[in-house]
Amino acid sequence: MKISKTVKRILDNYESDSPGTKANLARILMNGKLGGTGKIVILPVDQGFEHGPARSFAANNAAYDPHYHFQLAIDAGLNAYAAPLGMIEAGAGTFAGAIPTILKVNSANSLATNKDQAVTGSVMDALRLGCSAIGFTIYPGADEQFGMMEEIRELAEEAKSVGLAVVMWSYPRGGKLDKAGETALDICAYACHMAALLGAHIIKVKPPTDVLWQPEAKAVYEKQKVDISTQAKRIQHVVQAAFIGRRIVVFSGGEAKDTEGLYKEVRALRDGGANGSIIGRNTFQRPREEALALLDSIIKIYQGKE
Protein backbone atom coordinates (compact mmCIF):
# COMPACT_ATOMS: atom_id res chain seq x y z
CA MET A 1 0.00 0.00 0.00
CA LYS A 2 1.44 3.32 -1.08
CA ILE A 3 0.95 6.05 1.54
CA SER A 4 0.51 9.67 0.45
CA LYS A 5 2.50 12.54 1.95
CA THR A 6 -0.72 13.94 3.44
CA VAL A 7 -1.46 10.68 5.23
CA LYS A 8 2.15 10.38 6.41
CA ARG A 9 1.83 13.82 8.01
CA ILE A 10 -1.35 12.74 9.78
CA LEU A 11 0.28 9.53 11.03
CA ASP A 12 3.20 11.56 12.40
CA ASN A 13 0.75 13.14 14.88
CA TYR A 14 0.33 9.76 16.60
CA GLU A 15 3.75 9.76 18.19
CA SER A 16 3.24 6.97 20.74
CA ASP A 17 1.57 4.44 18.47
CA SER A 18 3.03 1.22 17.14
CA PRO A 19 3.63 0.47 13.46
CA GLY A 20 0.64 -1.88 13.61
CA THR A 21 -1.76 0.81 14.80
CA LYS A 22 -0.41 3.31 12.28
CA ALA A 23 -0.80 0.71 9.53
CA ASN A 24 -4.45 0.25 10.43
CA LEU A 25 -5.01 4.01 10.47
CA ALA A 26 -3.31 4.16 7.07
CA ARG A 27 -5.64 1.46 5.71
CA ILE A 28 -8.61 3.64 6.59
CA LEU A 29 -7.02 6.86 5.34
CA MET A 30 -5.81 5.33 2.06
CA ASN A 31 -8.99 3.43 1.14
CA GLY A 32 -11.71 4.49 -1.29
CA LYS A 33 -12.22 7.55 -3.44
CA LEU A 34 -10.81 9.87 -0.76
CA GLY A 35 -7.80 7.64 -0.13
CA GLY A 36 -4.65 9.66 0.44
CA THR A 37 -6.38 13.03 0.78
CA GLY A 38 -6.60 13.09 4.57
CA LYS A 39 -10.39 13.18 4.29
CA ILE A 40 -12.61 10.22 5.15
CA VAL A 41 -16.23 9.15 4.81
CA ILE A 42 -17.34 6.17 6.89
CA LEU A 43 -20.64 4.27 6.83
CA PRO A 44 -21.87 3.42 10.36
CA VAL A 45 -24.71 0.96 10.81
CA ASP A 46 -25.30 0.71 14.55
CA GLN A 47 -28.77 2.23 14.39
CA GLY A 48 -30.57 -1.12 14.63
CA PHE A 49 -29.22 -1.47 18.16
CA GLU A 50 -29.82 2.18 19.01
CA HIS A 51 -33.31 2.68 17.55
CA GLY A 52 -34.64 -0.75 16.54
CA PRO A 53 -34.89 -2.47 13.14
CA ALA A 54 -38.07 -0.87 11.82
CA ARG A 55 -37.02 2.69 12.65
CA SER A 56 -33.67 2.01 11.05
CA PHE A 57 -34.42 -0.11 7.99
CA ALA A 58 -38.13 -0.06 7.08
CA ALA A 59 -37.59 2.93 4.78
CA ASN A 60 -35.39 0.68 2.61
CA ASN A 61 -36.09 -3.02 3.12
CA ALA A 62 -32.81 -4.05 1.50
CA ALA A 63 -31.04 -2.50 4.49
CA TYR A 64 -32.19 -5.33 6.77
CA ASP A 65 -29.44 -7.40 5.09
CA PRO A 66 -25.94 -6.87 6.59
CA HIS A 67 -24.39 -7.62 3.19
CA TYR A 68 -26.22 -4.62 1.76
CA HIS A 69 -24.22 -2.24 3.93
CA PHE A 70 -20.85 -3.81 3.18
CA GLN A 71 -21.59 -3.59 -0.54
CA LEU A 72 -22.92 -0.03 -0.30
CA ALA A 73 -19.75 1.14 1.44
CA ILE A 74 -17.55 -0.67 -1.08
CA ASP A 75 -19.43 0.50 -4.18
CA ALA A 76 -19.55 4.08 -2.88
CA GLY A 77 -15.77 4.09 -2.44
CA LEU A 78 -15.88 4.86 1.27
CA ASN A 79 -12.94 4.67 3.64
CA ALA A 80 -14.45 2.22 6.13
CA TYR A 81 -17.57 0.51 7.44
CA ALA A 82 -18.49 0.53 11.15
CA ALA A 83 -21.02 -1.78 12.81
CA PRO A 84 -21.73 -3.91 15.90
CA LEU A 85 -20.54 -7.48 16.28
CA GLY A 86 -23.37 -9.37 14.59
CA MET A 87 -23.50 -7.13 11.53
CA ILE A 88 -19.78 -7.54 10.84
CA GLU A 89 -19.85 -11.27 11.60
CA ALA A 90 -22.64 -11.70 9.04
CA GLY A 91 -20.44 -10.45 6.21
CA ALA A 92 -16.91 -11.00 7.48
CA GLY A 93 -16.17 -13.94 5.19
CA THR A 94 -17.77 -12.63 2.02
CA PHE A 95 -16.16 -9.20 2.32
CA ALA A 96 -12.85 -10.10 3.99
CA GLY A 97 -10.24 -7.54 2.94
CA ALA A 98 -12.67 -5.62 0.72
CA ILE A 99 -12.99 -2.57 2.99
CA PRO A 100 -11.54 -1.57 6.38
CA THR A 101 -13.99 -2.31 9.18
CA ILE A 102 -14.54 -0.79 12.61
CA LEU A 103 -16.13 -2.97 15.28
CA LYS A 104 -18.50 -0.97 17.47
CA VAL A 105 -17.83 -2.51 20.88
CA ASN A 106 -20.53 -0.82 22.95
CA SER A 107 -24.18 -0.16 22.25
CA ALA A 108 -27.33 1.40 23.69
CA ASN A 109 -30.97 0.68 22.95
CA SER A 110 -34.16 2.71 22.99
CA LEU A 111 -35.81 0.50 25.63
CA ALA A 112 -33.49 1.73 28.38
CA THR A 113 -34.15 4.82 30.48
CA ASN A 114 -30.60 5.60 31.60
CA LYS A 115 -27.93 7.18 29.41
CA ASP A 116 -25.41 4.37 29.21
CA GLN A 117 -24.13 1.69 26.84
CA ALA A 118 -23.31 -1.97 27.33
CA VAL A 119 -20.01 -3.44 26.14
CA THR A 120 -21.12 -5.71 23.28
CA GLY A 121 -17.84 -6.58 21.57
CA SER A 122 -14.20 -7.11 22.40
CA VAL A 123 -10.73 -6.42 21.06
CA MET A 124 -10.39 -10.15 20.37
CA ASP A 125 -13.60 -10.00 18.32
CA ALA A 126 -12.11 -7.16 16.28
CA LEU A 127 -8.90 -9.12 15.65
CA ARG A 128 -10.80 -12.29 14.77
CA LEU A 129 -12.90 -10.38 12.23
CA GLY A 130 -9.94 -8.57 10.65
CA CYS A 131 -11.08 -5.11 11.75
CA SER A 132 -8.82 -2.07 11.56
CA ALA A 133 -10.27 -0.40 14.65
CA ILE A 134 -12.68 -0.59 17.53
CA GLY A 135 -15.40 2.02 18.02
CA PHE A 136 -16.78 3.14 21.37
CA THR A 137 -19.36 5.72 22.47
CA ILE A 138 -19.04 7.94 25.52
CA TYR A 139 -21.76 10.26 26.87
CA PRO A 140 -20.05 13.27 28.47
CA GLY A 141 -22.51 14.72 30.98
CA ALA A 142 -24.39 11.49 31.71
CA ASP A 143 -24.55 10.03 35.21
CA GLU A 144 -22.69 6.97 33.87
CA GLN A 145 -20.00 8.97 32.03
CA PHE A 146 -17.12 8.03 34.33
CA GLY A 147 -17.79 4.31 34.02
CA MET A 148 -17.84 4.66 30.23
CA MET A 149 -14.54 6.53 30.31
CA GLU A 150 -12.96 3.83 32.46
CA GLU A 151 -14.23 1.15 30.06
CA ILE A 152 -12.74 2.80 26.99
CA ARG A 153 -9.49 3.47 28.81
CA GLU A 154 -9.04 -0.28 29.31
CA LEU A 155 -10.30 -1.22 25.85
CA ALA A 156 -8.14 1.41 24.15
CA GLU A 157 -5.04 0.17 25.95
CA GLU A 158 -5.77 -3.39 24.83
CA ALA A 159 -6.60 -2.34 21.25
CA LYS A 160 -3.43 -0.32 20.86
CA SER A 161 -1.35 -3.14 22.31
CA VAL A 162 -2.41 -5.38 19.41
CA GLY A 163 -2.17 -2.71 16.71
CA LEU A 164 -5.80 -1.62 16.38
CA ALA A 165 -6.94 1.99 16.07
CA VAL A 166 -9.54 3.54 18.39
CA VAL A 167 -12.55 5.48 17.10
CA MET A 168 -14.56 7.33 19.73
CA TRP A 169 -18.12 8.59 19.38
CA SER A 170 -18.30 11.48 21.90
CA TYR A 171 -21.95 12.45 22.33
CA PRO A 172 -22.86 14.77 25.22
CA ARG A 173 -26.19 13.82 26.80
CA GLY A 174 -27.89 13.11 30.09
CA GLY A 175 -27.28 14.64 33.49
CA LYS A 176 -27.90 18.39 33.53
CA LEU A 177 -27.73 18.74 29.73
CA ASP A 178 -30.89 19.65 27.84
CA LYS A 179 -31.36 19.17 24.07
CA ALA A 180 -29.82 22.55 23.30
CA GLY A 181 -26.82 21.66 25.42
CA GLU A 182 -26.15 18.41 23.57
CA THR A 183 -25.10 20.27 20.42
CA ALA A 184 -23.96 23.58 21.94
CA LEU A 185 -20.58 24.69 20.63
CA ASP A 186 -18.81 24.79 23.98
CA ILE A 187 -20.15 21.35 24.90
CA CYS A 188 -19.27 19.76 21.53
CA ALA A 189 -15.74 21.16 21.73
CA TYR A 190 -15.46 19.89 25.32
CA ALA A 191 -16.66 16.42 24.27
CA CYS A 192 -14.17 16.36 21.41
CA HIS A 193 -11.35 17.34 23.75
CA MET A 194 -12.33 14.63 26.25
CA ALA A 195 -12.15 11.98 23.51
CA ALA A 196 -8.69 13.20 22.52
CA LEU A 197 -7.60 13.11 26.16
CA LEU A 198 -8.89 9.53 26.44
CA GLY A 199 -6.62 8.44 23.60
CA ALA A 200 -8.88 8.33 20.55
CA HIS A 201 -7.26 8.25 17.13
CA ILE A 202 -10.47 9.24 15.34
CA ILE A 203 -13.14 11.31 17.10
CA LYS A 204 -16.77 11.51 16.03
CA VAL A 205 -18.89 14.40 17.29
CA LYS A 206 -22.06 16.15 16.21
CA PRO A 207 -21.99 19.41 14.21
CA PRO A 208 -22.33 22.23 16.77
CA THR A 209 -24.88 25.02 16.92
CA ASP A 210 -24.06 28.59 17.97
CA VAL A 211 -25.44 27.98 21.47
CA LEU A 212 -23.01 28.50 24.36
CA TRP A 213 -24.45 26.40 27.16
CA GLN A 214 -22.13 26.69 30.15
CA PRO A 215 -22.23 30.23 31.60
CA GLU A 216 -18.57 30.01 32.61
CA ALA A 217 -17.55 28.97 29.10
CA LYS A 218 -19.81 31.57 27.47
CA ALA A 219 -18.03 34.31 29.42
CA VAL A 220 -14.66 33.13 28.09
CA TYR A 221 -15.88 32.87 24.49
CA GLU A 222 -17.19 36.42 24.68
CA LYS A 223 -14.13 37.82 26.45
CA GLN A 224 -11.71 36.17 24.00
CA LYS A 225 -13.93 37.07 21.03
CA VAL A 226 -13.96 33.52 19.66
CA ASP A 227 -15.57 33.71 16.22
CA ILE A 228 -18.63 31.43 16.15
CA SER A 229 -20.52 33.37 13.48
CA THR A 230 -20.65 30.58 10.86
CA GLN A 231 -20.88 26.82 10.93
CA ALA A 232 -17.42 26.59 9.34
CA LYS A 233 -15.95 28.70 12.15
CA ARG A 234 -17.66 26.52 14.75
CA ILE A 235 -16.31 23.37 13.10
CA GLN A 236 -12.85 24.93 13.08
CA HIS A 237 -13.13 25.51 16.82
CA VAL A 238 -14.15 21.90 17.52
CA VAL A 239 -11.20 20.64 15.45
CA GLN A 240 -8.96 23.02 17.41
CA ALA A 241 -10.12 21.27 20.60
CA ALA A 242 -8.66 17.99 19.28
CA PHE A 243 -5.09 19.11 19.94
CA ILE A 244 -5.27 21.79 17.23
CA GLY A 245 -6.03 19.15 14.60
CA ARG A 246 -3.48 16.54 15.71
CA ARG A 247 -6.33 14.06 16.01
CA ILE A 248 -8.72 13.08 13.21
CA VAL A 249 -12.14 14.65 13.76
CA VAL A 250 -15.22 13.56 11.82
CA PHE A 251 -18.82 14.63 12.21
CA SER A 252 -22.08 12.70 12.29
CA GLY A 253 -24.84 13.02 9.75
CA GLY A 254 -27.60 12.62 12.33
CA GLU A 255 -31.24 12.13 11.44
CA ALA A 256 -32.20 11.96 7.78
CA LYS A 257 -32.41 15.39 6.18
CA ASP A 258 -33.04 16.79 2.71
CA THR A 259 -30.23 16.53 0.19
CA GLU A 260 -29.43 20.23 -0.09
CA GLY A 261 -29.38 20.62 3.69
CA LEU A 262 -26.94 17.74 3.92
CA TYR A 263 -24.67 19.16 1.20
CA LYS A 264 -24.66 22.56 2.89
CA GLU A 265 -23.62 20.95 6.15
CA VAL A 266 -20.82 18.95 4.49
CA ARG A 267 -19.46 22.08 2.79
CA ALA A 268 -19.29 23.76 6.20
CA LEU A 269 -17.47 20.72 7.58
CA ARG A 270 -14.97 20.88 4.73
CA ASP A 271 -14.47 24.62 5.04
CA GLY A 272 -13.98 24.31 8.80
CA GLY A 273 -11.20 21.75 8.42
CA ALA A 274 -13.06 18.61 9.44
CA ASN A 275 -11.45 15.35 8.37
CA GLY A 276 -14.75 14.02 7.13
CA SER A 277 -18.12 12.49 7.90
CA ILE A 278 -19.57 9.35 9.45
CA ILE A 279 -22.94 9.19 7.78
CA GLY A 280 -25.50 6.40 8.15
CA ARG A 281 -29.25 7.00 8.09
CA ASN A 282 -28.95 9.77 5.52
CA THR A 283 -27.61 7.15 3.10
CA PHE A 284 -28.93 3.66 3.81
CA GLN A 285 -32.52 4.81 4.35
CA ARG A 286 -32.57 5.97 0.71
CA PRO A 287 -32.83 3.71 -2.36
CA ARG A 288 -29.42 2.29 -3.27
CA GLU A 289 -28.81 4.32 -6.43
CA GLU A 290 -29.87 7.51 -4.68
CA ALA A 291 -27.57 6.70 -1.77
CA LEU A 292 -24.64 6.08 -4.11
CA ALA A 293 -25.24 9.38 -5.90
CA LEU A 294 -25.46 11.23 -2.59
CA LEU A 295 -22.25 9.69 -1.27
CA ASP A 296 -20.47 10.49 -4.52
CA SER A 297 -21.50 14.13 -4.18
CA ILE A 298 -20.33 14.22 -0.55
CA ILE A 299 -16.97 12.81 -1.61
CA LYS A 300 -16.71 15.42 -4.37
CA ILE A 301 -17.39 18.17 -1.81
CA TYR A 302 -14.49 16.93 0.30
CA GLN A 303 -12.38 16.78 -2.86
CA GLY A 304 -13.26 20.41 -3.54
CA LYS A 305 -15.11 19.56 -6.76
CA GLU A 306 -18.58 20.72 -5.65
Each language-model region and where it sits:
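A C-terminal functional module that forms or caps the active site or interfaces directly
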Residues: A256
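N-terminal basic, low-complexity leaders that serve as flexible interaction/assembly modules and, when applicable
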Residues: M1-V45
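Catalytic or ion-translocation cores adjacent to nucleophile or general acid/base/metal-coordination motifs
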Residues: E290-E306
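Alpha/beta enzyme core
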Residues: M1-K2, G35, I40-I42, Q47-Y81, ...
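Conserved residues at beta->alpha junctions
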Residues: G253
